[in-house]
Amino acid sequence: MATRRLPAVTQTDGSRTATESGVPEYEDQIRSYRNDQRRRHIWAGRGRRLLSIMPGVSSSERTLEMQMNPEVQLQRSMNHRAEAVPAEVLYRTFHGSVNHRVYSHRSEERMMVVNGSQVDRSFIQESSFEVLSRTGIEFIHIGVMLVRIQILHRKFAGTMALIVFRDTRWSDDRAVLAAMEIDLSEGNQIVYVLPDIMMTIKSFYRHIQICVMTKGYDGWQGEDNLLITRGLTGRLSNTSNVGFAYDVKAMVEHLQSNGVKAIKGEKWDAKRFHNGQWNIEPSKVVVPMQPTEMKAVSNYDGTTSLRFSNYAAASTSKPPQYNEKDEEINEDEQEINHSLNLILNDEESTDEDEEYYQYQRYAWSQVGDSTFYYDTDGVWEEIDRCNDLPEYVPSETSTPTIDESEAIIDEFLEHAYEQRCDSDESLQSGDPRKYEYPTPQSSPEHLDNESRSRSSSASSTSMQDDVEEIVRLMKEMRMKKQKKKKAQQALSSQAQEEPIIEENIEENKQAQEEPTQEEIPTHKENQPEEIQNEEIHVFEEEPAFKHLAAQLSELVNMAESSGQSGVGFQPPVNAQPDVNMEGPAGYAPATSQATWSNGVNIPVKSANFRWKGPVGNFQLPSAQGKDGAMLVFGMNYSPEVFDRWASITRNYISSFNFNDGGDKIAWMEDLLGETERKIFVSWRMRFKDEYQNLAKIANQDGGTQAILSQIRRIFLGEDPVLGQNTVQNIAFRKLKQLVCPNYQSIRRYLMDYLTLAAETGLMWSETEGPAISEELFTKMPAAIGERVAQAYKIMDPTSAVNLPSRVYFTINYLTEQCKEASYMRSLKALDFCRDFPIEGYYGRSGEKKKYTARKATKYTGKAHDNHIRVTKAKYQRKCKCYICGQEGHYANQCRNKHKDQQRVAILQSLDLKENEEVVSADDKEEEDDEIFSVLGEEDYQEETIMVLEEDDIQQIIKEFSKFGDLSRRNVGPNFPGPAEVQMGVLKPKSSWRRPIQATLEEINCHHNWTAISTGQLACRSCKQFLAGVQCHHCHAVYCFMCAEAYHDVQAEKILSKDYSFSARGKKGKAVIIEEDEIEGEFLISQLQQENQRLQKQVERLQEELMKLHREKDEALKHSEKASRVFSTIQESDEAELNLIKEELRQFKEETRMAIAQLKEAIIVQEEDTIEERCAMILEEKHTENIYSATAKAEYNGLYNVKVGIKPDNMEPYYINAIVDTGATACLIQISAIPENYYEDAKVTVNFRSVLGIGTSTQMIKAGRILIGEQYFRMPVTYVMNMGLSPGIQMIIGCSFIRSLEGGLRIEKDIITFYKLVTSIETSRTTQVANSIEELELSEDEYLNIAASVETPSFLDQEFARKNKDLLKEMKEMKYIGENPMEFWKNNKIKCKLNIINPDIKIMGRPIKHVTPGDEEAMTRQINLLLQMKVIRPSESKHRSTAFIVRSGTEIDPITGKEKKGKERMVFNYKLLNENTESDQYSLPGINTIISKVGRSKIYSKFDLKSGFWQVAMEEESVPWTAFLAGNKLYEWLVMPFGLKNAPAIFQRKMDNVFKGTEKFIAVYIDDILVFSETAEQHSQHLYTMLQLCKENGLILSPTKMKIGTPEIDFLGASLGCTKIKLQPHIISKICDFSDEKLATPEGMRSWLGILSYARNYIQDIGKLVQPLRQKMAPTGDKRMNPETWKMVRQIKEKVKNLPDLQLPPKDSFIIIETDGCMTGWGAVCKWKMSKHDPRSTERICAYASGSFNPIKSTIDAEIQAAIHGLDKFKIYYLDKKELIIRSDCEAIIKFYNKTNENKPSRVRWLTFSDFLTGLGITVTFEHIDGKHNGLADALSRMINFIVEKNDESPYRFTSSVEDALKVCNDDHGRNLISAVINDIITVLRR
C-alpha cells in the first residue's frame, strides 16, 4: 500500500448517465490554478526559443492551433476524449486562489434533430449552475468552448448540421457568437470557439446557449440521430482581471478534418444544401426563475392575493440527504459526480504530473460506473473498472530522489523540444510512472521573470538571461523537493503499519453513496499537512461488479418508466413545422398523414341511422354558483361537450383571484361531475410530479388554459391547443368523405361541411383552404352545385378562401330559388289576367318565334321537309301526326316515344295561332290552300354607338350611389362629378374579403388621412357609421377595419397624430356646420360680385341707349339730305349685285364644263387601259436584271408575327414568332432573348418533336406579351436551344390559345382572338432582322442609298478663320485619311459570328458565266483589298459568292458630273446569315435624332472611311466569311458588308465610343453629326469628337465632311434654320426611277424603300402606297396595271412639289389632326406659339400615315388614327404640358368630354382611354366641321377613287366632287377644290 500526497482539487457532483433522449451525461471540475504547470508551459516555450538559435535545429513556433491539432483530436475522439486547451495555457498566473478558480465542463447528450426542428440547449446544466453558485464566485470568463457531433447512423447519408453559439441577452443578430455549418458525411466533426467573454455566472447559465439544426433527414423514422458533446474551459473570478493570455483575432476558429473512413456504401453528398438558408427560431430553453418583489392585494371576501414580479434566475435546491446515522449531509462534503472533459494537452508534461493524475484515476474510480485516467498525452480516457484498470502495486515510496530530480531536469533541458511521436511511444510502454506532486506556489519574482520572458526578443543576450533564469528556478525547486521528501517518507511509514481493508460490493456502494473524509480531497490551504499526506487505498474490483451493476441499472430504469404518466403535463409543441402554436391558445390544423381507420366493414342491413347535427342539444348542470357549469359527459362523450364546458369555465374563472396554482386546480376540480372528478383525482394521486408541475404554472399567464388542456388530455387523450391533431385529422378524413347525394339533404350537408371544416383547422390554410372552399359546391348534386358555384363566382370573383361566405351564399341562393319556385307555382293558373287589362300590350307580335308559317307558293304535289299542313283544331278529319307520322292524333297530343326530334324542335319554335294545329303534308294534297312552308329567321346584331346624354346622368348617380354616398360631404373639389365618374376595382389585402368598386381617383390618390368620430359619415365598404378615417384629397371615408383592409391604414398611427374621439365628441357636427357656413358665405360673396357687374353693365347700356337717341335726333335733322343720298346708293348697289351674279354664273358654267371634260377623260383613259392590258399580255417577255444581293425575307408559308416580350417592370423585347396550333407549349430560342428576361423553371420539361427530344430548364419571367396592338398575359414559355428555321425565334402554341379561354379564328393571313376580340395580321415570310422600321429598309438598302450620293466637302470660311489652329491640328492628325486600318490596334470591339449550327457547311453557288469586263473589274478590286490587308487567301471549308454589279452613281472628279453605273463588288452571304443568330441591338430612331438636332444653329458632319472595315473580325469567325472571287478563295480580316449583324455591331461600337456626348453629337451607323448653338461651343464640341476618334482608332473620310455650316443634309433630310425638307438627291432618286425597274418586284421594293424617306413630308402617303405594297406580298399580283401607273405618277408629282416643314420651337403649342377611313389613317402635326393663337398662325412640322389590313369600321378607324398619330409624334409633345387633338369624329369628342361607361364596344374605348391616360399630359379634343375641312375631305375622296378599281368609280368620283362643291360656301374652299380638280385632270391626261 502506497501513501501519496494529494493535490488541492475541489470536485462537485458526479457523472450522470443518460437513460433517455434529451437527458445529458455531464461532468464538472472546479480546481485551483496549477502554477507549476504554468511554469512548465513557459519553460517549454523558452526552451524552444533557445533551441531555435542552435545550429542544425529548425526554427518553429508552437501556436495554439498546433497544440489543438484538429486531425489528431478528431481521430482520437473515436477511442478517447477530445481535449481542449489547458487553463494554464489560456490564463496567466495569479496570487490568491480564493478569488480565482479554473472551471472545466464536459457533457454528452443524445438527441433527435430532424428537418424542420430546432434544438436549443443551455451550455451547462442546472446542476452545474448550482455548483458554480455555491463557490461564492461572481464572474466567469469563457476561454474556449468545443462541440463535437457524432452521428448515430451510417456515414455518407447526405446530411448536414448547423451549430450556433449565441448569447440570448441580445434580441437581434448580435446574439450569435459563432455559427458553423457542418458536413456529417464522415461521421463526426469538432467545432472550437474562443469567445473571450466575461460575465456573471447567472448570465452564463441563462443566456449562453447552443442551437442545433439539421438537413437531409427526410424520411427519418428512428429515434436519436446525433450525439452532442460539449466542453468548456474557463476561469472563475471575483475580480475584473482574469489574465486571459491568448490573442483572439477571430471570434470563431473552426478546425475540421476528414475523419475516419468506413466501408464504402452508396454515397450521398450534401451539396444540395450548400448556400442554403437556416431559420433559427427563438430559444425555448426553460430556466427556473424566482421573484424578487411581491405585491399584496386584499380581496372582497377577506382573502389576500399575492402577486410576484421581477423574476431572476433561481438555483433549485435538492431534497436533503442523510447518512446511516440519520445525519444530514452537507452539499459541500458530497462526493463529486461528474468530471472534466477538457484536460491539459501538453506533450512536454513531466513525470511529476503523474502523481496528480494517478490520484485522479483513483478518485474517479470511487465515483461512478466508469474510470478516467490521464495518459502520457494528457488525455482523460474512460476505461472499464474491472477489466481495464491496472493493478496497483504498492511501493515504499513514490518520491524520486534528488539525483533523480536532477536527472529529470537535465533530461528536460536536453530534450525540451521532442516530437509528439515520443509521447505516443511512451503511452505504449505500460503503466504510467508515479511521481510526487509538488505543492504549487507562486512568487512575485516568478511573475516578473515570466513577464520579461514573454517580452524578450530572440537575440543572444536575451537567450542568455533566459538560461540563467531557468537554472535559478530549478535550484529553488530542488530545495523544495528535499524538504518535502522527509514528510513523504514519514507518511509512507505510517501507512505501512495500517492494515488493508478489503471491501465487498455493498461496502463499495456505500462508500460511493456516503464518502468519508479520508476519500474526499480538499484544498491544501485549508487542511493541515498530516491530512494532506493521508493514505490512499487502491484495490482491485471484483469481476461480478459489472454484471450486478447492469442488473441494478435495468431495475432502476423499469422503476422510472413505470412511474411516468402517459398523459403528463406537456407545454404546447409544434405538431407541424409550419404551424406556430405560440401566443394565445391556438388550434392545430390537421395533417395530410393517414389517421386510424376502422379496418372492419360491418354489414348494414336495416339499421336505423340518424343524422348527427353539428350542435348537440346537451346542457351541462349548474355549478350552483353564478354562471359556472359542471362537466358531465353522460351519453354525449364527445369533444363538443368539453369545448362548451371549457368556454364556460374560462369565462367564469376570469373574475377570481387565487393564492397559488393548487387552489386554482382544486377549485376547478370541484366543477367536474361525480365520475369525472374521480377520474381526475385518481390521476392526481398517481402522478404527483406532473401535478406539481401543473400547479407551478397554474396561476401564471395562460395557467387556466394549461389546466383545461391537461383535463382534456386526461379525458380525451389529446388537445389541439397543444398542437396535437388527432381530432383534426379525423375531421379532415370525414370531410373528404362527405358527399351530398340528393336535394333533400342540402341544408344538413351545409351544416356538416361547415362543422367538419372548422374542426380540421385548415379552413383558412393557403394550401388546403381553396380546395375545401371549392369542394363545397362540387360535392353537392351536379346541377345545383354548378349553378351555385357560377353565381358565387359572379358575386365574388376574387375570393379564394372563405368557406363561411360560400355557405351563407348557398343558403341565400337556395332560399331565393325556393321563393321563385313558390311564385311560379302560384302563377301556374293565370285565369285572373283577363280581369286586369294592362298598358303597352299589343298582342304576340313582340314575342317572335324562330320559325313562321307562310302560304306555300311552289307546292306542286310534292311535299318537302319544310312543308306542313295547318288546320283548325278539333277538325273532324283523318289526320297524321307531324312529329311521329301516325294517324289519329295531333302533334301536341302525341305520346309516341319514337319522335322526329328535328320536327319537335321546329314545332316548339313555330309561331301559330291558338286554334291552329300542324299535321304532316303528304304528296298530292287536295286542299293545297292548307299547305304552308316553314321559314327560319336569321339572327343578327347591329353594332351601335351609344353616347350618354344629360338624361342619363341621374342613372349614373344611382349606379354610383351603391359604392358610396354622393353627399356634399363626399363630393369635394377633387371628386369627379356625375358625368366624369370612372370606376375601378379596389382589392383588399386579405383573400377572404371581397373587392369593392371605387373611383379611379380614389385608387390613384396619395391619401392624407384624418380621423373622424362615430356617427359622422358612412364607411364606403361596410356602410356603417363607425369611427374611421377620411382622406383630404379624394374625400374617401372608411372605418378603421376597412381602412386597414383596403388601404393598409393603421389606426394607432392615425390616432397618434389626430386628437382623440373623446375630445372631438360633440364637435363633429359643429365642424360640418362651420364648413357649411363658410361655403355659404363664399357663395354669397360671389353673388354680390356678379350683381355689381350686372349693375355696371346696365349703366353702360343705358349710356349707349342715350347716345343712340341723340344720334337719331341728328339723323332726323338731316333727313332730306339722307333721302337724296339713298337713291344714289340704291342704284350703285343694284349694278354691283348684277355684276357678282354674272361672275357666279360664269364660275358654275366653268365648273360644269370641267366636270364634263373630266368624265370624257376618264372614259378615254379606261379605253386606253384596256388596250394597254392586251398589249402587255401579247408582248410579255422574260428579263433578268441584277440590282443587289440583298437577302430577302424567308418564305415559310407559316403564320409569322412580330411579338413583344415584356416581363414585369421591364421594357418590351421584340422577336419574330409563328402561331402554331400543333405545338403543345410556347417555346423561345435561348439565343434570341436576353438572360435577364428568363429564369430557372421549377421543373425540368422534356419536349418531343421530329428532330428528337429536347430539354428545357428555363422559362420566361411572368409578365405580358404584345401581339399586334393588344397585350395578353404571358403564357408559360420555356427557353431552350431549338433548331428552328431562319428568322423564327419563338413558337406560340396551344398553351397560349388555351389560356385565352375564348376562341381562335384563322382567315387567310388574319388571326382573331375572341377573348378580347383582337385581330392580328400575319405574313408568310419571316421578319427581316435589324430592319430600319422607320424607313422600312434593310441595312444594306440604306447603305446603298447613302453611298449612291457623293457629298462634297465644305468648310465655312468664317468658321475657318476663327478656328485656324483647330483645323491645322486636324490636318496633321492621321485619323483623317484614306487608310481605315491606320489605328486598327485601338479597336476595342470585334465582330463575332454566333453560328446556330457549326456543322453546316456554307456552299454558295459559283457564277458560271463571267464577262471579261467583270473578270477584270473583280481582279482590280481583289488586288486593292489585298493591298489594304483587309482580306487574305483562305483554305476554309465554307464558300460564299462574290460578283460585280454596276448600280448607283458617282461623281467624276475631273468634270464634276454625275456618272451612273458605278461598279461595286457584292457578296452573297444569304446562307451564312441564315445560319447566324440575330443581334437584337436596335438602331436609334431617325425622327428622334432629327427633332433633337433640328433647332441647332451650326453643324458639322463626318463619315467614316469604309466604316465597317474599321471593325476587326474574331479569329474564329474569319473562316466563315470566305468568298469565291474568280477561281480563288479569300476571307475577310475586317467586318464585311452584307452580314446581317454588321449594322448592329457597328452601331454598338459607335454608341460606346460617343457615350456621354449625346447632347451635341448624333451618330447613325457611320454618320457623325456635331451640332451646337454657337461657334465657340462648336469648336469645343469638335475637339471632343476628334479626341474620341483618336482614342478609339476611328478614321474619318477627308472627302465627305462638312464643317461649320448652318445647313446640313443628314439621314435623308436637309436641316437648317429650324426647317426640315427632303434631300434633293432623294427627290431625284424617287422621281427619276425608271419604269422598267418599277415593273419588276425588286425594283418596286427598292423604290418603295427610297420613298420611305418622304413619308414625313407627304400627307396620307400610307394610304397611297397600300395597293403597291400588296403587290410585294407572296400572293399579290405582280403585274402593273394602268391604275398602278397612275398612282406611281401621282406620287412622283407630289414628291416634286414637297413643302418645307418647320420644326416647332421649345415653347410652342402642339396640335395633331387625325383622320381615318376603313383602309388607312393619316395625321398632321402642327404647332403655334400659344394655345389661343388663331389657326392662321399654325405651321406644319410632320406628316404620318398608314394603312389598315384588314379594314376597320368607321369608329375603330378614327380611334386608331388618333392612337397612331399620337404614337408617331411623341417626340414633338412629350415635353409639353397640354395637347390638342382635332378629329371630325363626333363620337370621340363626346366620349372624351363625358364618360366612357356602358359602351357597347368596351375594348376600343378602354384601349383609347388607357393610351390617353398613359401620355401623362393634358389632352383636349376639338371637332373639325366639314366646311373647315374641305381640303382633307376632298383628298380623302380622291384617295378612295384611286384605290377603287370597279367600273362605277368615275361616276362616283364626279358625284363626290359635286357634293364637295355644295358644302363649300366660301371662296377659300371653292378655290381649293378647283385646284384639286385641275391637278387630277392633269394627271389623267398624262
Swiss-Prot record:
Listed GO CC annotations: host cell
Gene Ontology process terms (BP): proteolysis; symbiont entry into host cell; transport of virus in host, cell to cell; viral penetration into host nucleus
UniProt: Mg(2+) 1 binding residues: D1715, E1758, D1784
Start and end residues of each Reverse transcriptase domain: 1425-1615
InterPro entries linked: Aspartic_peptidase_AS, DNA/RNA_pol_sf, Peptidase_A2_cat, Retropepsins, Rev_trsase/Diguanyl_cyclase, RNaseH_domain, RNaseH_sf, RT_dom
Keyword set includes Transport: yes
EC annotation from Swiss-Prot or TrEMBL: 3.4.23.-, 2.7.7.49, 3.1.26.4
Annotated Polar residues bias: 9-20
Listed Low complexity bias regions: 488-498
Region feature (Disordered): 1-24, 420-466, 478-529
Source domain of life: Viruses
Transmembrane segment boundaries: none
Keyword Repressor: no
Catalytic activity, as annotated: Endonucleolytic cleavage to 5'-phosphomonoester; DNA(n) + a 2'-deoxyribonucleoside 5'-triphosphate = DNA(n+1) + diphosphate
Residues of the active site: D1220 (for protease activity)
Residues at which Mg(2+) 2 binds: D1715, D1833
Posttranslational modification: Polyprotein P3 is presumably proteolytically cleaved into several chains by viral protease.
Domain RNase H type-1: 1706-1841
Alphabetic keyword roster: Aspartyl protease, Endonuclease, Hydrolase, Magnesium, Metal-binding, Nuclease, Nucleotidyltransferase, Protease, RNA-directed DNA polymerase, Transferase, Transport, Viral movement protein, Viral penetration into host nucleus, Virus entry into host cell, Zinc, Zinc-finger
ZnF (CCHC-type) intervals: 879-896
Function: Capsid protein self assembles to form a bacilliform capsid about 90-900 nm in length. The capsid encapsulates the genomic dsDNA. Following virus entry into host cell, provides nuclear import of the viral genome. Virus particles do not enter the nucleus, but are targeted to the nuclear membrane through the interaction with host importins.
Descriptive protein name: Polyprotein P3
